[in-house]
């Protein structure tokens, strides 16, 4: 098993997206930290995955296509578009995936590839937000469209 981190807007959404993929064993929701100037805690998830089923580059592509990867984020902000990597191989694969995304969309991808430094878990009541009650208005409005996108564009990796 391997781990990789993602940040991109609300961690409830990010958690729900990765929980919907084959090969993802666990998603830990909370706040991630990198090196300066990205050392402020920001919402995100740590994804534990089986690389025999799903590669880090595919996880990064799913991430890029299910949040505002071309948006502007502040290093000090609570939200940031980022891939938090645990080694050089993940760094290179994430950078290639982001460059390909920018080429495919014709938009600048402002998603940063950052070294993982730290993680603080969310309060228990916020964990598994989508899975505990997918009928919540927030889930229906923001997470359901992302899951529909996964089922349409990553059908072979989408859980039923």
Positions of PLM-derived features:
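Flexible coil/turn and secondary-structure edge motifs
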Residues: 1-160
